[in-house]
């Protein structure tokens, strides 16, 4: 199985989300699966303009904006599963991920053009979420998770599940053996058909 990971932490390799992603990816790859990781804070991603230029081509994203999204579009279209890996700030994902998600809604869903409703290029793909937050998961990540469930219904994707781990504060160590075990178990869960 091939996975595209959209990683969106402003603290990059020093982040709690990255600490959780490492054992997840080790387990995923050790089982013979592949993953392509995009660190969104390192890329140039313009916000969607809702210009509908992408709606003229029903076979390809065809976004008219010139930035780093074409490589992400291509990777997602080649993937079986999309993993959103991000900290939760203000009850939602950081801005680069939100910008990418908005671009997917238009460029990969041909619902808005002059020819009427076309296909979703994401149809049948799976989506999973790996997040970290400061609140209890049911109060910190719940709105983002619900938003992504609705996003999956809109895009005709299959929502699989989410792993959310809590950080108790900068004076506490985030990563521990229990979190690592849950990250590895989450990778194994996503390997199931």
Feature-to-residue mapping (PLM):
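Short coil-to-beta-strand
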Residues: 1-3, 157-160
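Short, glycine-/small-residue-rich phosphate/pyrophosphate-handling segment
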Residues: 112-158
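Beta-strand-loop-alpha "switch" segments that mediate conformational coupling across diverse proteins
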Residues: 161-166
């Amino acid at each position: 199985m091939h996975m595209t990971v959209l990683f969106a932490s402003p603290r990059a390799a020093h982040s709690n989300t990255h600490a959780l992603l490492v054992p997840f990816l080790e387990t995923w790859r050790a089982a013979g699966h592949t993953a392509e990781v995009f660190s969104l804070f390192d890329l140039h991603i313009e916000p969607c303009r809702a210009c509908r230029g992408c709606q003229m081509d029903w076979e390809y994203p065809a976004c008219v904006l010139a930035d780093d999204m074409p490589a992400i579009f291509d990777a997602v279209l080649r993937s079986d599963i999309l993993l959103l890996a991000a900290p939760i700030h203000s009850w939602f994902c950081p801005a680069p991920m939100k910008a990418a998600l908005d671009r997917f809604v238009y460029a990969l869903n041909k619902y808005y053009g002059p020819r009427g409703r076309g296909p979703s290029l994401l149809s049948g793909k799976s989506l999973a979420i790996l997040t970290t937050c400061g609140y209890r998961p049911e109060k910190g990540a719940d709105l983002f998770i619900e938003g992504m469930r609705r996003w999956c219904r809109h895009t005709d994707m299959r929502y699989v599940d989410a792993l959310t781990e809590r950080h108790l504060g900068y004076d506490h160590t985030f990563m521990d053996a229990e979190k690592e075990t849950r990250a590895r178990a989450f990778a194994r869960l996503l390997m199931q058909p």
